[in-house]
């Protein structure tokens, strides 16, 4: 197996998901650990959300503040730590078509399965924020053409997703967004289309039926979102939930912080007891981070004199190890 084999396999897997006539649910977040959690929960792909990267790296909104190096470094870590395909949010491509060329090639080299580039003006705004403005159709098509050419020079399996933000922009309409999406595929060469801010079932169903490429969407309508079965019946290929893991983590952290301030250590005991009874309590968290691999490498390659003394020290011992003695309390003094 070569270094690139796992990367190629994940890219081919992502293309297989896009080619299937069924819905794929794609959770999103910002960290390798969240991607691993999604993998362990049985999801087939994961989204590195630019909004979450901005929030958790810098504590700022999704306004084009993160840079290419931020994205590529994070994407590389995420791709290396999980076995499912990663689609990354490359915002506007960090510039014009020339910048897009380098953005795509850096992301290809990072080992992810694909990237999305949106048609907003720079500096961009969040895909759910008011005040968005879009570049011209010609400029957008040129950016996607540049993305495809840069991709083809390195790995044609890498997926280019074109995101259309016209529906949420000033004066935008479904008719214009629909025509743009078709042009991004027909003239730009995009493999996947993200119709952003779609608000009605009728519009989404038409987009899935008539755009000549798989469609990705996030529901933005005022009425309740379609069920996953309804999405699949419409022909939607990817239902994206870009912030769900981070939102769940923030909600839990906020709850626990307030309970700790109000009740002291009792809150931690209650929280740990509840976690132990939940699905989370059944997760091997050390295995999730790769601790067994560390122990295996120590046992295989370190001299006996240099190996960590798991038997005689306090703390966690890898479950597979020979040192099975339970942790002993630390001696006072």
Regions from the language model: what does each represent?
Residues 2-8, 14, 244-333:
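Extended, intrinsically disordered, low-complexity segments
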Residues 3-217, 221-241, 248, 258, ...:
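Alpha/beta enzyme core
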């Amino acid at each position: 197996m070569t270094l690139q084999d796992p990367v190629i396999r994940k890219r081919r897997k992502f293309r297989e998901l896009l080619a299937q006539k069924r819905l794929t649910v794609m959770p999103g977040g910002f960290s390798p650990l969240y991607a691993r959690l999604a993998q362990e929960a049985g999801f087939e792909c994961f989204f590195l959300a630019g909004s979450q990267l901005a929030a958790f790296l810098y504590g700022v909104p999704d306004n084009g503040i993160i840079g290419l190096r931020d994205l590529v470094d994070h994407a590389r870590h995420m791709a290396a730590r999980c076995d499912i395909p990663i689609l990354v949010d490359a915002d506007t491509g960090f510039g014009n078509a020339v910048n897009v060329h380098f953005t795509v090639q850096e992301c290809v080299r990072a080992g992810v399965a694909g990237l999305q580039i949106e048609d907003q003006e720079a500096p961009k705004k969040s895909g759910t924020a008011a005040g968005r403005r879009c570049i011209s159709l010609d400029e957008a098509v040129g950016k996607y053409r540049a993305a495809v050419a840069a991709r083809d020079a390195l790995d044609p399996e890498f997926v280019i997703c074109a995101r259309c933000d016209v529906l949420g922009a000033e004066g935008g309409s479904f008719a214009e967004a629909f025509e743009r999406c078709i042009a991004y595929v027909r003239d730009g060469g995009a493999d996947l289309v993200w119709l952003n801010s779609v608000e009605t079932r009728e519009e989404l169903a038409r987009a899935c039926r008539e755009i000549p490429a798989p469609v990705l969407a996030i529901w933005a309508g005022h009425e309740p979102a379609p069920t996953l079965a309804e999405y699949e019946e419409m022909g939607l290929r990817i239902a994206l939930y870009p912030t769900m893991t981070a939102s769940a983590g923030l909600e839990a952290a906020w709850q626990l912080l307030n309970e700790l301030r109000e009740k002291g250590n009792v809150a931690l005991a209650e929280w740990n007891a509840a976690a132990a009874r939940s699905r989370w309590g059944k997760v091997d968290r050390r295995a999730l981070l790769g601790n067994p691999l560390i122990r295996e490498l120590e046992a295989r390659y370190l001299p006996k004199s240099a190996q960590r003394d798991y038997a005689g020290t306090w703390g966690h011992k890898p479950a597979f190890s020979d040192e099975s003695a339970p942790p002993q309390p630390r001696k006072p003094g």
